[in-house]
């Protein structure tokens, strides 16, 4: 669950079923953390090993697994290596593999199309193809196109969700992740990132918090049990949200102070196809188009296309995927890879997409033995990859014509994306482009460095099995990266 508090910090505890979840530690997309300020200096490549060892061999990390590989971008010469060919849970660094394959196989200008076909007799068929950027704005555009065609009434609207085959939620994802906005379902009809919101508004002391739904239609799908309360200004604030396995009951507990700003809670939809149809009915109504029966089917024949919208080009989708570590986008791109392949009845879209990733990475020179993938985002703990896999991918992509698009999609140290709050006022600021990753006990960072006194560098650093807070691990990783930016030939 993504919970936003405006103007005032709020201590939050989100509870799903009977388990308490520290949601910030579960997210595959990495959080930002400011690195310690480091003065600019130089280090010889021959001294690098000793300097890195001094960081990772601290007693603080005695129980931690480190995987590190540092090489010049232009060659396979190793500047530093530690368990670089052993498996680690990569977290969101895995997105580097998914996006590399998508860019190679689909091309930077690839777009995902959502179409409406006229099948005659007042029947329209809408075909979703898993566009993760689709929003209410695009639904309104579709409704306007239908109005321009002279359509004022639709007797039946058929939603064909056959484009993406298989489970809408990866079965290897953990339950608490599935209940959070970063674990939203992935299907043919993704709308508003398959997330809905509700706002909790403080009232007079002793009164329940007011629950305000941003989507009145969505409110009708839930039974809400509100056990929250408004408290005096000197009291702590916290919110407990319980969602039952059936997905039909929301229990709201906890308290906000009377002077608190409203809190906005994002939750994943549980019926994305029908969520799409409900929202589309609303869009049609604003154009004075009446809609009769709606139906979800898997397959069918498309006739004349009378309306469509398209996603931004893949080059822009990659930026959202990598810079903001968007899980939904990464999973949608994995399925887009499958959509361009012949359909196999016995395989899901994820199966086919992962095969496409493997084929693409092999062409880039990545050893297939260096990874085991089960999703496209890195949210699953069953994903395994070696630091060498990421270095091989980064180097391979740098040699392709689309390498500049790939690199431009990455967060930039101290400037952009999930690295915006890290490396500020260090020698790494502005010259490191890298992908972050975070799960509980896992922190990773892999990317490129334009070392000012050395040739360009490619690196991968992965930490697993750690009991230390992610902030501590990031600071250590950042120290190592700063060392790499200070490399010079001696």
Feature-to-residue mapping (PLM):
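Small-residue-rich helix-loop
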Residues: 79-81, 334-490
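Short active-site loop at a secondary-structure junction
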Residues: 81-101
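C-terminal segment of classical bacterial N-terminal signal peptides
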Residues: 18-27
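Conserved serine DD-peptidase/penicillin-binding transpeptidase domain
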Residues: 29-43, 47-50, 54-56, 105-367, ...
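A short glycine/serine-rich beta->alpha loop
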Residues: 83-88, 266-267, 377-380
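A short, well-structured edge-of-sheet supersecondary motif
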Residues: 56-82, 296
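Bacterial N-terminal signal peptides that target proteins for export
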Residues: 1-11
């Amino acid at each position: 669950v993504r919970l936003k508090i405006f103007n005032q910090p709020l201590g939050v505890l989100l509870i799903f079923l009977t388990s308490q979840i520290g949601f910030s530690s579960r997210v595959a997309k990495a959080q930002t953390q400011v690195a310690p300020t480091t003065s600019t200096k130089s280090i010889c490549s021959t001294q690098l090993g000793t300097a890195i060892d001094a960081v990772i061999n601290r007693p603080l990390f005695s129980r931690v697994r480190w995987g590190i590989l540092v090489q010049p971008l232009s060659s396979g010469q190793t500047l530093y290596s530690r368990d670089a060919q052993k498996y680690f849970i990569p977290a969101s660094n895995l997105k580097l593999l998914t996006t590399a394959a998508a860019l190679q196989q689909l091309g930077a200008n690839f777009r995902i199309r959502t179409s409406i076909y006229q099948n005659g007799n007042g029947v329209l068929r809408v075909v979703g193809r898993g566009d993760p950027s689709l929003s209410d704005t695009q639904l309104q555009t579709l409704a306007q196109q239908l109005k321009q065609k002279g359509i004022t009434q639709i007797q039946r609207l058929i939603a064909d969700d056959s484009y993406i085959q298989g489970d809408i939620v990866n079965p290897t994802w953990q339950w608490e992740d599935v209940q959070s906005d970063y674990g939203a379902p992935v299907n043919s009809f993704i709308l508003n990132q398959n997330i809905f919101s509700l706002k909790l508004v403080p009232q007079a002391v002793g009164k329940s918090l007011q629950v305000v739904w941003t989507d009145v239609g969505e409110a009708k799908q839930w039974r809400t049990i509100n056990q929250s309360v408004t408290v005096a200004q000197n009291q702590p604030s916290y919110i407990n949200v319980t969602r039952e396995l059936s997905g039909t009951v929301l229990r709201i507990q906890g308290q906000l102070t009377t002077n608190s700003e409203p809190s906005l809670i994002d939750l994943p939809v549980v019926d994305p196809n029908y969520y799409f149809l409900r929202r589309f009915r609303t869009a049609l109504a604003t154009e004075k188009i009446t809609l009769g029966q709606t139906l979800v089917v898997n397959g069918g024949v498309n006739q004349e296309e009378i309306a469509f919208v398209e996603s931004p080009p893949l080059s822009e989708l990659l930026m959202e995927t990598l810079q903001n570590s968007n899980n939904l986008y990464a999973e949608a791109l994995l399925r887009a890879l499958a959509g361009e392949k012949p359909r196999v009845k016995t395989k899901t879209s994820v199966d086919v997409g992962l095969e496409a990733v493997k084929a693409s990475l092999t062409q880039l020179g990545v050893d297939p033995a260096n990874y085991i993938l089960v999703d496209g985002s890195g949210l699953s703990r069953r994903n395994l990859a070696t630091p060498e896999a990421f270095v091989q991918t980064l180097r391979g992509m740098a040699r392709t014509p689309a390498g500049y698009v790939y690199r431009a999609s990455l967060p930039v140290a101290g400037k952009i994306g999930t690295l915006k709050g890290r490396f500020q006022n260090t020698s790494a600021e502005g010259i490191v482009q890298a992908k972050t990753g975070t799960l509980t006990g896992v922190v990773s960072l892999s990317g490129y460095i334009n070392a000012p006194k050395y040739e360009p560098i490619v690196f991968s650093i992965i930490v697993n099995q750690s009991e230390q807070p992610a902030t501590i691990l990031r600071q250590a990783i950042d120290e190592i990266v700063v060392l790499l930016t200070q490399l010079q030939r001696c």
